[in-house]
Structure formats: C-alpha cells, structure tokens
C-alpha cells in the first residue's frame, strides 16, 4: 500500500510539474535534448560535467518521466537520472555488471535492465523518500545492506560500473564510515571499473557544503574528477540550481527554512576509476 501511495505521489508531481512548466514558458527538458543532435561525450568532457549546469540538459538523454519538466520545475533527480542514463549508454558495454547504491525503486534500472545486469544495494529504510519494505525486484538483484558493510552477497571485483543518485549525502559523515564506504566500492569494482556519483550539495553565500566522501575520494584516488571550488561554482552563470518552485513544493515542509536561508541545493558529480587504473 505504501509503495502504491509513493507511486501515486510521483505521478501527481510529474503531472503538476509539466503543467507548471507550460505556464512558466520556455522549452521542456525533452525539447532541449532534442534540439542537440550531436551529444557531447561525458567521459571525454568530465570536467565540464563536474557539477550541474543549465547547458547540460541539451547534452543529455532525458528519461520520458522527466521530459515534460523544464529547468524551472525539474528536481535534482531529473538532472541526475539524465546524466547517469546518458553516461551508461555512452560508456558501458551491454551485458556489463552494474551496481546502483541506494536505488530504491530505481528509474535507471527500469529503463536499462534488459541491456545490463543490475544489482541494487539498498537497506530500504526510506531515506530520501525511498521505499521502506522489500519489493518485486524485476530485472535486477536487490541486496538489502549498506555500502561500507562489505556485504557477502556482492562478490569482490565483480562490477564494471557503480553509481548513485542523491544517495551519498545521506551517508554518515564520520571518518570511519567514509573510509569503509570508499574501501567497499574499491572492493566491488572490477579492474578498470569506474564510479559516477551524483551528490546533492548546498551552496551557501560563503561556502559549499558537500559530503566529506567527495574530498576524501579526490585526495586518495588520482583518477577522481570533480570540482569543489566555491569560487568557481558560485560565479558560474551556467550553474543549474534546484528551482524556487521545486524547493517549495518538495523540500520546504522538511527543511522549514526559506530557500535563501537554507542555501541553494545543487548537484556535484564525481567520477573515478578503481585503484587509479
């Protein structure tokens, strides 16, 4: 029953977002994507994709569920789903083994499970509006555990690609947890395997608040790529931030703070390969 209610709420948001996007005017995400026929390879331009930009929507394949939203109404997952979907299609060979961390009722797995072998590592505790109980894992394998717990259900060096969407920011921030999570990902990645994580961050007037796992990954893996420069991000006119409309319809009831006080939610993308390979 709870899963059905969540599905209903998601569909309701999709309908309302599309309606508001039409009222506000401008092109939808789907139209922006269709306008650009020659997509930019993400991996070859990973520095450009280090954080969410308005111009990215033209370069990404937009899942149908998000196609009628606009940059003025989209939520973080609309951007993050599109980035991960495009990256996988551009860079991961069909049949590859892929692990999503904290996928819940994963939209990416639903779209691509016929082409790739998917696992979803999720404790199912409802974090970030996710499911709280087991579900029918059609087309993939569900493992109910945490990243960093070294689950025996996930074999060493067995995954070609690991990704997460709005998950890393929910992990505990203590040094031990961060170290264990990175070590577990390294354990799970096959030689030459790679990670791409889309992480929610908060841009304040004087600083960037982001989970410490990103900084640790940058300091310990020479292949890690992202941009955590407050100076660069805060002055980028192309920066895409969570829209005013979306903040007040999705998050205000949780934060109980005005957007100006809370800070601007943005997406940071971090990529790396196993063991510096």
Feature locations, PLM:
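Helix-to-beta-strand junctions that scaffold the AdoMet/dcAdoMet cofactor pocket
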Residues: 93, 171-172, 189-191
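A short glycine-rich, Lys/Arg-flanked "PGG" loop and its adjoining helix->strand segment in the class I
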Residues: 176-191
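Conserved Class I S-adenosyl-L-methionine
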Residues: 206-239
């Amino acid at each position: 029953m709870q899963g059905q209610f969540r599905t209903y709420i998601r569909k309701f948001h999709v309908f309302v977002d599309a309606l508001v996007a039409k009222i506000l005017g401008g092109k939808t995400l789907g139209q922006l994507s269709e306008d650009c026929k020659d997509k930019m390879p993400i991996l070859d331009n990973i520095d450009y994709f280090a954080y969410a930009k308005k111009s990215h929507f033209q370069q990404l394949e937009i899942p149908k569920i998000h196609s009628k939203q606009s940059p003025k109404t989209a939520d973080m997952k609309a951007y993050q789903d599109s980035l991960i979907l495009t990256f996988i299609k551009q860079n991961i060979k069909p049949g590859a083994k892929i692990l999503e961390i904290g996928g819940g009722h994963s939209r990416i797995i639903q779209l691509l499970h016929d082409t790739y072998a998917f696992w979803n590592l999720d404790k199912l505790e409802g974090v970030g509006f996710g499911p709280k109980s087991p579900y029918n894992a059609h087309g993939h394998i569900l493992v109910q555990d945490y990243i960093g717990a070294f689950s025996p259900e996930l074999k060493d060096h067995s995954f070609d690609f690991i990704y997460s969407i709005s998950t890393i920011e929910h992990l505990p921030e203590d040094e031990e947890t961060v170290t264990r999570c990175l070590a577990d990902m390294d354990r799970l990645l096959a030689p030459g395997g790679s990670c791409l994580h889309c992480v929610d961050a908060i841009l304040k007037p004087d600083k960037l608040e982001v989970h410490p796992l990103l900084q640790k990954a940058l300091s310990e893996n020479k292949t890690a790529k992202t941009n955590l420069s407050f100076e660069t991000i805060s002055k980028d006119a192309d920066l895409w931030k969570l829209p005013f409309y979306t903040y007040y319809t999705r998050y205000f009831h949780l934060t109980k703070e005005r957007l100006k006080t809370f800070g601007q939610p943005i997406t940071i993308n971090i990529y790396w390969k196993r063991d510096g390979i």
